[in-house]
């Protein structure tokens, strides 16, 4: 029986064969930001330290990819949020700041205009000259 770490490594090796552009020799020069889905969690959430969303029981996929030389980061957006709210939260997390959902949106859906504060940007130098892969 293979360990979770062995299964993770095998899965990633198969992925490199199927997607050669994702291999270290063909990697993008930009950071890759992983954004979890509904009911998920990211690196800023306490649960991530115990059970990383990207890998779960198999281990920390992003930690493995970073150790292989990739620049991978895990965003933390609302676990049950609209696409609008998640986009606002992701932008605030990428750039550093507080999620601003807008006055009209907040009034229409009956929630606060401002959400989570992200004092430290996930990608400090993100901009036109430094894009990210999502």
Where are these regions (language model features)?
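N-terminal non-catalytic accessory region
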Residues: 2-134
């Amino acid at each position: 029986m293979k360990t979770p770490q062995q299964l993770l490594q095998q899965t990633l090796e198969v992925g490199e064969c199927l997607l050669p552009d994702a291999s270290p020799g063909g990697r993008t020069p930009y950071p890759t930001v992983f954004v979890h889905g509904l009911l998920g969690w990211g690196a800023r959430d306490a649960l991530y330290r115990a059970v990383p969303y990207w890998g779960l029981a198999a281990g920390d996929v992003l930690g493995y990819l970073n150790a292989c030389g990739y620049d991978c980061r895990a965003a933390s957006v609302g676990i049950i949020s609209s696409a609008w709210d998640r986009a606002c939260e992701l932008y605030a997390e990428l750039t550093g700041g507080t999620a601003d959902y807008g006055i009209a949106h907040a009034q229409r859906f009956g929630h606060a205009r401002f959400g989570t504060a992200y004092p430290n940007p996930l990608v400090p130098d993100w901009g036109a000259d430094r894009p990210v892969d999502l």
